[in-house]
């Protein structure tokens, strides 16, 4: 696999070649994913739940993400690595740039921030400093207490229009990628069609430019609640490498996610 860059992802969108992404937190899984077709790894603050056992992602620190980013980068020099910026690490442009720099030094190719138009100045500042940005709209887990739980967003037209407006604002500020989480598939298509930057969906149907899953959901080892949008590929294939290959193949072909995994 040749080195994946922002230009690679833009070309994939233009050619309608679906982007495959998974979360990872260590070198072994990064290498496994690299060897079996994954193009993007997210070092997600989801580690607060799947690794640290928390009820949400709010306890994750910038140092946690930096540590796991270094581990992931050690497993692959070619994969495109996105590092999540944890809760309250991007409350001002200055804080955002300082904390993002730590993640870039740890080996990230891009940082991800949750939120809409209010992030404009911070994203602009990051872009001016040469730090690529991924936005995140829809169900943004760091706002779980505002939403009253992990709930589908954007079903009401007013909400949908706000998400579309936020997406356009993030792109205008300089964001080069956008994650759409737990929104109706029809809305995900509207957002994807409205942007020139690639979109990556999780619980957003199969009309986005790519897909991402939490690796624990991919192999069916999630504790407790199993999201509607997840699929246990290990159950279907019997071993980890084949599970990853099957995920990538199904994303590329459009077989995953299917109608049973999307929200209306």
UniProtKB/Swiss-Prot annotation:
Keywords: Cytoplasm, Magnesium, Metal-binding, Pantothenate biosynthesis, Transferase. One of its GO terms (biological process) is pantothenate biosynthetic process. Its EC number is 2.1.2.11. Its cofactor is Mg(2+). GO terms for molecular function: 3-methyl-2-oxobutanoate hydroxymethyltransferase activity; magnesium ion binding. It comes from the Bacteria. Binds 1 Mg(2+) ion per subunit. It catalyses: 3-methyl-2-oxobutanoate + (6R)-5,10-methylene-5,6,7,8-tetrahydrofolate + H2O = 2-dehydropantoate + (6S)-5,6,7,8-tetrahydrofolate. The active site is at 181 (proton acceptor). Mg(2+) binds at residues 45, 84, 114. It holds the Pfam family Pantoate_transf. Belongs to the PanB family. Catalyzes the reversible reaction in which hydroxymethyl group from 5,10-methylenetetrahydrofolate is transferred onto alpha-ketoisovalerate to form ketopantoate. This is 3-methyl-2-oxobutanoate hydroxymethyltransferase. It comes from Pseudoalteromonas translucida (strain TAC 125).
